[in-house]
Amino acid sequence: KLVKEGNDVDWLSIPVRELGVGHKHTVMAEGGNESFRYAFDLFYSNKVGVMKGSKRDNYGGGIRLQYNLKNLKFSNYASFDHLKSVNSPYGSFSSYLYYNPYYNPYDENGNVKKVLYSYEYYDRGITSKTMYNELYNAVLPSKNQQTSNNFLNNFSIEYDIIQGLKLKANLSLSVDNGKTDVYKSYENTEFLDKEKKGSYAQSTSNDFSYDINVILSYFKSLKKHFINLGFVYNLQEKQYDNTSIYVVGFPNANMDHVSICLLYTSPSPRD
């Protein structure tokens, strides 16, 4: 019947972009004199994926300062990086490999159909089989994205206290945080046989670390003999905080906040 209707749908082209254009911009500058130097850079890049709706936005920058004042030298470099990745609402490309060209994803009014095809057959009784439309899930409210932020600061100082006696110190500071959000509408075909429809999975990570390194050294030459003394102090700390939640049951497709749910639960292996 479907073949006679004359449908010839190129399913593999539906979730794929015809043309993807990305761009990248960078600005750099430096200057100063013998006692003071500076440099900074800013960047922004946008990359679009092969699947419709997928993209990666990345921006950030850094600044470097360096001072040379007689017997005192110190420098500092600070940088920030932000990345946001958005996955395609069309799901996995492999899902479209199993659709025959005579399956029409649209009804007579041009609306996306929820069910592509259903039929009944006899197997120790009457059994029905239904094939759902992956494109239907693509047009529903959804969210599948990751964001991350990274801040890094490196500070170093070098001081010649007296001839032969030198102090060096370094401080490294790093702050990282990330967030992942995956929301599926209660109308998604995944929840047809489930009591609690709609789901939201959210995970957050917050990492903090620092590293302090201090070196005090003394060197002196006495004719054929040398005196070399050193003191090293190192302090490190790393903190990790990761949280994951999975909630189900959303009364409205446009209510996509984790607090608007009926139940906190754990995802099944297939989720």
Regions found by a protein language model. Name each.
Residues 1-7, 49-54, 60-150, 168-266:
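Surface-exposed loop/interface segments of Gram-negative outer-membrane beta-barrel transport/assembly proteins
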Residues 18-19, 148:
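A conditional alpha-helix N-cap/helix-loop micro-motif detector
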Residues 153-156:
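Alpha-helical support elements that line or immediately flank enzyme active sites
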Residues 267-271:
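A short, hydrophobic C-terminal helix/tail in secreted or cell-surface proteins
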